[in-house]
Design a protein with these regions (language model features):
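Hydrophobic residues embedded in beta-strands of well-ordered beta-sheets
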Residues: 11-13, 56, 64, 137-138, ...
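Carbohydrate-binding surfaces in secreted/extracellular proteins
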Residues: 2-32, 96, 165-200
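Secretory/extracellular carbohydrate-interaction modules
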Residues: 38, 69-147
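Broad, structure-driven detector of short, well-ordered beta-strand segments within folded domains
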Residues: 2-6, 42, 122-137, 171-177, ...
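Flexible glycan-contacting loops in extracellular carbohydrate-active proteins
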Residues: 25-57, 195-229
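Low-complexity, Pro/Thr/Ser/Gly/Ala-rich linker/spacer regions in secreted
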Residues: 55-74, 230-235
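Short, aromatic/His-centered strand-loop micro-motif at the edge of beta-sheets
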Residues: 1-3, 146-172
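Predominantly extracellular/luminal cell-surface or secreted proteins
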Residues: 14-18, 45, 114-118, 185-191, ...
Length: 235
Protein backbone atom coordinates (compact mmCIF):
# COMPACT_ATOMS: atom_id res chain seq x y z
CA UNK A 1 0.00 0.00 0.00
CA UNK A 2 1.58 3.29 -1.13
CA UNK A 3 0.20 6.65 -0.03
CA UNK A 4 1.34 9.92 -1.58
CA UNK A 5 0.19 12.96 0.38
CA UNK A 6 0.79 16.55 -0.73
CA UNK A 7 1.08 19.26 1.94
CA UNK A 8 1.96 22.70 0.62
CA UNK A 9 5.16 22.37 -1.41
CA UNK A 10 5.97 18.96 0.07
CA UNK A 11 5.03 15.43 -0.95
CA UNK A 12 5.11 12.60 1.59
CA UNK A 13 5.38 8.95 0.57
CA UNK A 14 4.46 6.09 2.88
CA UNK A 15 4.84 2.54 1.56
CA UNK A 16 3.62 -0.38 3.68
CA UNK A 17 4.31 -3.98 2.62
CA UNK A 18 2.64 -6.77 4.58
CA UNK A 19 4.16 -10.23 4.04
CA UNK A 20 2.16 -13.46 3.98
CA UNK A 21 3.52 -14.27 7.45
CA UNK A 22 2.28 -10.94 8.80
CA UNK A 23 5.63 -9.16 8.87
CA UNK A 24 5.24 -5.46 8.01
CA UNK A 25 7.82 -3.29 6.24
CA UNK A 26 7.21 0.47 6.23
CA UNK A 27 9.19 2.99 4.17
CA UNK A 28 8.75 6.78 4.34
CA UNK A 29 10.16 9.64 2.26
CA UNK A 30 9.35 13.33 1.71
CA UNK A 31 10.59 16.03 -0.64
CA UNK A 32 9.82 19.58 -1.76
CA UNK A 33 8.21 19.52 -5.23
CA UNK A 34 6.25 22.78 -5.51
CA UNK A 35 2.53 22.97 -6.22
CA UNK A 36 2.21 22.07 -9.91
CA UNK A 37 0.30 18.95 -10.92
CA UNK A 38 2.49 15.85 -10.82
CA UNK A 39 2.07 12.25 -12.02
CA UNK A 40 3.05 9.02 -10.31
CA UNK A 41 3.55 5.58 -11.82
CA UNK A 42 4.93 2.18 -10.84
CA UNK A 43 7.76 0.28 -12.52
CA UNK A 44 8.57 -3.43 -12.39
CA UNK A 45 12.17 -4.70 -12.32
CA UNK A 46 12.39 -8.50 -12.40
CA UNK A 47 9.07 -8.29 -10.54
CA UNK A 48 5.33 -8.51 -11.18
CA UNK A 49 2.60 -6.30 -9.71
CA UNK A 50 -1.15 -7.04 -9.59
CA UNK A 51 -3.13 -3.86 -8.95
CA UNK A 52 -5.97 -3.83 -6.43
CA UNK A 53 -8.22 -1.47 -8.36
CA UNK A 54 -10.73 -1.08 -5.51
CA UNK A 55 -7.96 0.16 -3.24
CA UNK A 56 -6.63 2.79 -5.65
CA UNK A 57 -8.16 6.16 -4.79
CA UNK A 58 -7.53 9.89 -4.89
CA UNK A 59 -8.71 11.70 -1.76
CA UNK A 60 -9.44 15.24 -0.66
CA UNK A 61 -9.79 16.42 2.95
CA UNK A 62 -13.28 16.46 4.44
CA UNK A 63 -14.05 19.81 6.06
CA UNK A 64 -14.13 19.32 9.83
CA UNK A 65 -15.24 22.41 11.75
CA UNK A 66 -16.66 20.69 14.83
CA UNK A 67 -13.63 18.93 16.29
CA UNK A 68 -15.27 17.86 19.57
CA UNK A 69 -18.76 16.38 19.76
CA UNK A 70 -20.45 16.35 23.14
CA UNK A 71 -18.77 17.22 26.44
CA UNK A 72 -15.76 15.54 28.02
CA UNK A 73 -17.88 14.34 30.96
CA UNK A 74 -20.04 12.34 28.51
CA UNK A 75 -23.21 14.05 29.73
CA UNK A 76 -24.65 15.00 26.32
CA UNK A 77 -28.04 13.32 25.84
CA UNK A 78 -29.21 11.49 22.73
CA UNK A 79 -29.92 13.61 19.63
CA UNK A 80 -28.67 16.86 21.15
CA UNK A 81 -25.11 17.13 19.83
CA UNK A 82 -23.89 16.33 16.32
CA UNK A 83 -20.84 16.42 14.09
CA UNK A 84 -20.64 18.44 10.90
CA UNK A 85 -22.56 17.20 7.89
CA UNK A 86 -20.43 15.23 5.41
CA UNK A 87 -21.74 14.90 1.86
CA UNK A 88 -21.09 11.64 0.01
CA UNK A 89 -21.67 11.76 -3.76
CA UNK A 90 -22.44 8.57 -5.66
CA UNK A 91 -19.32 6.51 -6.38
CA UNK A 92 -17.22 8.07 -3.62
CA UNK A 93 -16.05 6.97 -0.18
CA UNK A 94 -16.12 8.99 3.04
CA UNK A 95 -13.63 8.20 5.79
CA UNK A 96 -14.18 9.54 9.32
CA UNK A 97 -11.69 9.08 12.16
CA UNK A 98 -12.10 10.03 15.81
CA UNK A 99 -11.39 9.10 19.42
CA UNK A 100 -14.36 7.63 21.29
CA UNK A 101 -15.14 8.35 24.96
CA UNK A 102 -18.05 6.81 26.84
CA UNK A 103 -19.94 6.98 30.11
CA UNK A 104 -19.74 3.18 30.09
CA UNK A 105 -23.34 2.86 31.24
CA UNK A 106 -24.71 1.10 28.16
CA UNK A 107 -23.36 -0.70 25.11
CA UNK A 108 -24.79 2.12 22.97
CA UNK A 109 -23.12 5.02 24.80
CA UNK A 110 -20.49 5.52 22.11
CA UNK A 111 -20.49 6.81 18.55
CA UNK A 112 -23.67 6.78 16.50
CA UNK A 113 -23.88 7.36 12.75
CA UNK A 114 -26.73 8.64 10.57
CA UNK A 115 -26.90 8.57 6.77
CA UNK A 116 -29.68 10.80 5.45
CA UNK A 117 -30.83 12.76 2.41
CA UNK A 118 -28.99 15.92 1.40
CA UNK A 119 -30.80 18.33 3.71
CA UNK A 120 -30.41 19.64 7.24
CA UNK A 121 -32.13 17.94 10.15
CA UNK A 122 -35.67 19.31 10.28
CA UNK A 123 -35.54 20.47 6.66
CA UNK A 124 -38.39 19.82 4.26
CA UNK A 125 -36.40 17.25 2.27
CA UNK A 126 -34.71 15.61 5.26
CA UNK A 127 -35.23 11.87 5.69
CA UNK A 128 -33.02 9.20 7.15
CA UNK A 129 -31.68 6.15 5.33
CA UNK A 130 -30.42 4.56 8.53
CA UNK A 131 -28.93 5.16 11.96
CA UNK A 132 -26.23 2.75 13.13
CA UNK A 133 -24.86 2.36 16.65
CA UNK A 134 -21.53 0.97 17.81
CA UNK A 135 -23.20 -2.07 19.43
CA UNK A 136 -24.46 -3.86 16.28
CA UNK A 137 -27.87 -2.20 16.39
CA UNK A 138 -29.58 0.26 14.10
CA UNK A 139 -32.84 1.34 12.49
CA UNK A 140 -34.14 2.83 9.28
CA UNK A 141 -35.98 5.97 8.24
CA UNK A 142 -38.33 7.12 5.51
CA UNK A 143 -35.70 7.50 2.78
CA UNK A 144 -35.06 3.80 2.06
CA UNK A 145 -35.45 0.27 3.43
CA UNK A 146 -33.33 -0.77 6.42
CA UNK A 147 -32.31 -4.42 6.78
CA UNK A 148 -30.85 -5.55 10.12
CA UNK A 149 -29.80 -8.84 8.51
CA UNK A 150 -27.09 -6.90 6.67
CA UNK A 151 -25.17 -6.20 9.89
CA UNK A 152 -22.07 -8.34 10.41
CA UNK A 153 -19.13 -8.09 12.77
CA UNK A 154 -15.74 -9.32 13.91
CA UNK A 155 -14.41 -9.25 17.47
CA UNK A 156 -17.66 -8.68 19.36
CA UNK A 157 -18.99 -11.02 22.06
CA UNK A 158 -18.18 -9.90 25.61
CA UNK A 159 -20.29 -6.78 26.19
CA UNK A 160 -18.76 -5.97 29.59
CA UNK A 161 -15.32 -5.93 27.98
CA UNK A 162 -16.66 -3.97 25.01
CA UNK A 163 -17.94 -1.16 27.24
CA UNK A 164 -14.55 -0.91 28.94
CA UNK A 165 -12.61 -1.11 25.68
CA UNK A 166 -14.55 1.69 23.98
CA UNK A 167 -13.20 4.31 26.41
CA UNK A 168 -10.47 6.05 24.45
CA UNK A 169 -10.79 3.71 21.46
CA UNK A 170 -9.64 4.97 18.07
CA UNK A 171 -12.47 4.62 15.56
CA UNK A 172 -12.37 4.69 11.77
CA UNK A 173 -15.66 4.65 9.83
CA UNK A 174 -15.68 4.18 6.07
CA UNK A 175 -18.81 4.76 3.98
CA UNK A 176 -18.34 3.48 0.44
CA UNK A 177 -20.92 4.06 -2.30
CA UNK A 178 -20.99 1.46 -5.07
CA UNK A 179 -23.89 1.76 -7.49
CA UNK A 180 -27.14 1.98 -5.49
CA UNK A 181 -25.52 0.54 -2.36
CA UNK A 182 -23.70 2.10 0.56
CA UNK A 183 -21.27 -0.02 2.59
CA UNK A 184 -20.33 0.96 6.14
CA UNK A 185 -17.24 -0.44 7.85
CA UNK A 186 -16.51 0.78 11.38
CA UNK A 187 -13.28 -0.33 13.06
CA UNK A 188 -12.68 0.51 16.74
CA UNK A 189 -9.22 -0.20 18.14
CA UNK A 190 -9.06 -0.22 21.94
CA UNK A 191 -6.06 0.97 23.95
CA UNK A 192 -5.26 -2.69 24.72
CA UNK A 193 -5.17 -3.53 21.01
CA UNK A 194 -8.55 -5.27 20.84
CA UNK A 195 -10.32 -4.58 17.54
CA UNK A 196 -14.08 -4.41 16.99
CA UNK A 197 -15.28 -4.37 13.39
CA UNK A 198 -18.88 -3.65 12.42
CA UNK A 199 -20.18 -3.82 8.85
CA UNK A 200 -23.51 -2.87 7.28
CA UNK A 201 -24.83 -2.24 3.76
CA UNK A 202 -28.07 -0.94 2.31
CA UNK A 203 -29.61 0.19 -0.97
CA UNK A 204 -30.00 3.99 -0.98
CA UNK A 205 -30.09 5.00 -4.66
CA UNK A 206 -27.64 7.36 -6.35
CA UNK A 207 -28.71 10.80 -5.07
CA UNK A 208 -26.36 12.84 -2.88
CA UNK A 209 -26.50 11.85 0.80
CA UNK A 210 -25.16 13.27 4.04
CA UNK A 211 -23.60 11.50 6.99
CA UNK A 212 -23.17 12.80 10.51
CA UNK A 213 -22.20 11.49 13.95
CA UNK A 214 -24.31 11.68 17.11
CA UNK A 215 -23.33 11.25 20.75
CA UNK A 216 -25.38 9.57 23.48
CA UNK A 217 -23.73 9.92 26.91
CA UNK A 218 -20.50 9.87 24.93
CA UNK A 219 -17.87 12.26 23.61
CA UNK A 220 -15.98 12.20 20.31
CA UNK A 221 -12.74 13.95 19.36
CA UNK A 222 -12.41 14.16 15.59
CA UNK A 223 -9.11 13.33 13.89
CA UNK A 224 -9.43 15.90 11.11
CA UNK A 225 -6.21 14.77 9.39
CA UNK A 226 -7.80 11.39 8.66
CA UNK A 227 -11.24 12.57 7.56
CA UNK A 228 -11.43 12.59 3.77
CA UNK A 229 -13.52 11.91 0.68
CA UNK A 230 -11.99 9.44 -1.77
CA UNK A 231 -12.69 8.89 -5.46
CA UNK A 232 -11.69 5.75 -7.38
CA UNK A 233 -8.73 6.03 -9.75
CA UNK A 234 -10.24 3.33 -11.97
CA UNK A 235 -13.86 4.16 -12.88
Amino acid sequence: DITLERKGDEIYMTAVATAKNGTVYKEMYHQTIGQDVVRAFLIADASYLKMDASGCTVSEPAKVETTEIGTSDCSAAWWTTFSDYFQIPAGKTLNLAFENHTSGAGNWNNWNLCVATDDERGGGNYAEHFVMRSDLFGWGGAASVYNAANISNEGYGDWDQFRADMEGAKVNIQLQRIGDEIYMTAVATAKNGTVYKEMYHQTIGTDMVRAFLIVDSSYLKMDANNCYLASPVYE
